[in-house]
Regions:
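Gly/Ala-rich beta-loop-alpha elbow adjacent to hydrolase catalytic centers
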Residues: 83-92
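Flexible "cap/lid" loop of the alpha/beta hydrolase fold
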Residues: 97, 106-130
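Conserved alpha/beta-hydrolase "acid-adjacent" motif
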Residues: 166-172
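Hydrophobic, aromatic-rich cap/lid helix
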Residues: 2, 120-148
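Active-site loop/oxyanion-hole signature of alpha/beta-hydrolase fold enzymes
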Residues: 40, 49-81
């Protein structure tokens, strides 16, 4: 039917464990084995909700945030540590801005500043990076760029790069860490899948106890 738009899809992959909640959000099926393994590890000591969403891009992210918020209400998640994987990071970062009470901590894995940025957006971001902080260009793009709002992200945020991250994504994570007031950065790049997923889960569980009002900066570690 002409003009018909399919509602954005949010799928609960798993909901395991009990206690304090972790919510893992991703869109790329290539990460499915990793997030399943992380969810299983976290569920041994906390509640782990793994959610897959439709592809996040400059147009879809607004509807997906609304759909994710509705899903969290149905799941009775009132506060959680959120994990945004690749473009899924856009959704949890927006939640931290629009509904900060629900976000205890943020873990951002292999994410660029925008979801799936086009070549034009990459050029635009390079220009914006040279402007005074907080003055992004306004060229009609509806895409979410977390750099413009990083100074408002007050919850503790752990930035993680894995072996899957491209050099571009690694640079983007570093750039976010430089402007976000409460950010750490770690690398987990083991080729052993079990070591990698276990290390990620351990980081997430430990990071949940970070004081919410205790700004820190860029602790560099690697696994």
């Amino acid at each position: 039917m002409e003009g018909f738009m399919q509602a954005p899809e949010v799928k609960v992959v798993s909901d395991q464990g009990s206690g304090r909640a972790f919510v893992v959000v991703f869109d790329d099926s290539a990460y499915l084995p990793l997030v399943r393994s992380i969810g299983e590890a976290i569920a041994k000591s906390a509640r782990a909700v793994v959610i897959q969403v439709d592809q996040v891009n400059g147009e879809s992210w607004v509807g997906l945030v609304d759909a994710l918020s509705s899903a969290l209400t149905e799941l009775k998640v009132r506060q959680a540590s959120f994990v945004g994987v690749a473009a899924g990071a856009t959704l949890v970062q927006d939640l931290a801005l629009s509904n900060p009470k629900i976000v205890r901590t943020l873990v951002i894995i292999d994410a660029s500043l925008r979801p799936h940025p086009s070549r034009f957006e990459r050029v635009l971001d390079a220009i914006e990076a040279r402007l005074p902080f907080g003055l992004p260009l306004r060229l009609g793009s509806k895409s979410f760029n977390v750099r413009a709002f990083a100074h408002r992200l007050r919850c503790p945020m752990l930035l993680v790069s894995t072996r899957r991250a491209s050099p571009f994504v690694c640079r983007e994570l570093q750039a976010l860490g430089e402007v976000a007031p409460t950010a750490w950065h770690v690398e987990v790049k083991s080729d052993d899948f079990s070591v990698e997923s276990s290390a990620l889960a351990d980081y997430m569980l430990a990071f949940q106890d970070t004081p919410a009002k205790c700004p820190q900066k860029n602790l560099q570690e690697a696994v």
